[in-house]
Each structure stands twice: as C-alpha cells, then as structure tokens.
Amino acid sequence: MLAQQVFNGLALGMGYALIAVGYSLIFGILRLVNFSHGSIYAFGAEIAMVFIVSMKFGIVPGILLSMLVTGVLGIMIDKIALEPLRKKGSPPIASLITTIGISNIITNLLIVFIGSEKRNFPNIFGYGMIKLGKVSITLTQVMMCVVSVVLMLILVFIVFKTKIGLAMRASQQNAKAAKMMGIDVNFVISFTFFLAGVS
C-alpha cells in the first residue's frame, strides 16, 4: 500500500514539477511571483481539449498546438501588461498585482466561453496497467513521468547549453550589466515567458 501511494505521489508530483519550472523561470529573472501562471496552465488544458475533442486535430498535434498557444499567451502577457511597467520603473508590487488581475481575467474568460463544469481530459495512453508486485502502475502515470522528465531535460538544455540560455542566466544575475553587454533583456524576458507558458 505504501509503495503504491509513493508511486501515485511521484506521478502526480511530476506534473506539479513542470508547473513549478514555469514559476521558477520567471522568478529567476524578474524576481516576480507570476500569479497568472496557474491560469495559463488551465487555459492550455482547455485549449488542448478544444483542439483534440472539438476540432479533431488528434492528440499529439492538439497538445503541441496548445503548448504553442500558451507560449504565445505568455509573450502577450509580458508585452502588453508587464513590459510597460518595467519601462516606467514601477515597483515589483505593481507587476505582482498585475499578474493577479491577469489570472482573474483568464479564469473568468474560461468560465464565460467554456464553462465551469468538470470535464475529463481524453485518455491519451489507453487504460493499460503494469504490475510490479503489489504496485499497479497505469500507462498514463508512466507517460506522465516520462514526458515530464523529457520536458525538464529540454528546458535544462536550453538554459545551460544555448546562447539564449546564457543570456537568460546573465539577465538573472545582473540585468543592467547584461544590457551593457548588448543583451536584449526585454527579448530574454519575453522568451522566458514563452518557455514558462510552454512548460
């Protein structure tokens, strides 16, 4: 029983870890707790449902398209709501309150246009089950762990092995010095919002 609950917690925790990665990417550069991130995550799930169930795009294309949409939404939030505050030199609390407002807007738009009733996401990986002794593991749980690990490895590669990742880390350490070195910090921040939205 304990082993079963440990694995259930691990599979669920992998999903939460991906959400936390999005939070930490933005907090690392802006020192901003992005309260709209959870709403963006919910928006991505609803859009994926629309692509897969309503528009019949198929599971993989639907999920990839929804990731792209949430990434673009992240950029829009930064460009429309947060970048103007940075340019005005507004205090951090202004950006924090803005993200709370954005979260409320996204949540209420979802309720108005999609509804608030509970819906089950399509079972992508079937109902197969793997038995390891007394532990029963569904294919969905296995794939949640695999996909989460793969996405995290991709994010680690981007942050630590690419030029844009170097620019992100430079902006995190000292944004003013990064600007003096020719780094477009606003672009780096927008790219970070895109990554956070995709993840």
Spans of model-derived segments:
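Interfacial loop-to-helix junctions that mark the boundaries of transmembrane helices
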Residues: 1-8, 55-62, 90, 130-145
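Single transmembrane alpha-helix segments in multi-pass membrane proteins
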Residues: 2-53, 80-90, 94
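Alpha-helical transmembrane segments in multi-pass membrane proteins
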Residues: 16-20, 40, 44, 48, ...
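Alpha-helical transmembrane segments of polytopic integral membrane proteins
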Residues: 23-26, 48, 73-74, 78-79, ...
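Short helix-capping/hinge motifs at transmembrane helix termini and TM-loop junctions
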Residues: 31, 53-57, 86, 114-118, ...
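Alpha-helical transmembrane segments within multi-pass membrane transporters and channels
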Residues: 56-102
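Extracellular/periplasmic helix-loop junction at the C-terminal end of a transmembrane helix
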Residues: 103-131
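Helix-loop-helix "hairpin" substructures at the membrane interface of multi-pass membrane proteins
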Residues: 136-199
